């Protein structure tokens, strides 16, 4: 809790718990039922081109083909194309590269969950490349302390330093001809 947060940042004197005053009044409340939110994926060429994972899996070929056509219309060149449909193997989407990054994607919980999923599996040797950028140095330190970094590296992930950049494309760029998925904030 609060004691940990003061210690991990090394600035105990600067720490102040943020909370509403006793007599605080609000104009309204926004309640979000997080159990109703479904995981989504945004496809090229805009974050609004988004689908739930369930919808994508149920209509994989149709959605990817439509995305390829939309990109072709946008680019307007016959010598340049997007090939997503070739990433369908046995009715499932094959991903070649992944990035977990930034202040929104590189949170402790997100990285911990990825390490838990990957534990005992390997994605190295050309099968799947994963780069992980913790959102801050304190998050990196806690991931090291708890052994999460060890588990990620044992699974073939590359762990990089925290920096502001992966969200807008600095750092790992999509590999040539690869399908790359990213857990990060989207800047448009």
Q: Where on the chain are the PLM-derived regions?
A:
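Accessory "access/gating" subregions that flank catalytic or transport cores
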Residues: 5-126, 132-161
């Amino acid at each position: 809790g609060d004691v940990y947060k003061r210690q991990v940042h090394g600035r105990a004197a600067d720490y102040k718990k943020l909370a509403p005053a006793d007599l605080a009044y609000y104009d309204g409340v926004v309640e979000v039922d997080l159990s109703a939110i479904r995981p989504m994926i945004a496809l090229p060429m805009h974050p609004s081109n988004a689908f739930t994972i369930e919808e994508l899996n149920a209509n994989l070929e149709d959605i990817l083909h439509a995305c390829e056509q939309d990109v072709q219309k946008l680019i307007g060149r016959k010598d340049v194309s997007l090939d997503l449909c070739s990433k369908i193997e046995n009715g499932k989407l094959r991903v070649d590269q992944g990035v977990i990054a930034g202040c929104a994607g590189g949170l402790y919980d997100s990285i911990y969950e990825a390490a838990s999923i990957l534990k005992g599996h390997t994605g190295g040797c050309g099968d799947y490349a994963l780069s992980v950028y913790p959102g801050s140095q304190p998050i990196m330190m806690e991931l090291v302390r708890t052994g999460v970094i060890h588990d990620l590296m044992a699974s073939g992930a590359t762990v990089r330093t925290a920096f502001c950049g992966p969200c807008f494309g600095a750092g790992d760029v999509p590999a040539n001809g690869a399908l790359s998925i990213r857990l990060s904030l989207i800047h448009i």
